């Protein structure tokens, strides 16, 4: 069993989550945009997470969030679960929506780390073969 994720109150994170088999399940569309925005807003409100930025690409998403109350795991579980259920239903799918590994959460210690994650995220992802 892996060690529990260390989640500290007040930490800012770069969170990334991939779709199963890197499928393009988050392709831009009105449904994807509406579902992701709505669920992200509800999850942030429910768990008190501050969303600074996000980027949804065709097969994964990035979030830059601050977690004042160490609620990141519950926030992510809620976000991922509802996005998967809604988009699977809209696509007529029943398979796993997200990759089997957990989300990635990298602590952003300095303001420079936050700016770097915001400016390099999509560019770095698009340069990966």
Regions found by a protein language model. Name each.
Residues 1-129:
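Short catalytic/metal-binding and nucleic-acid-binding patches
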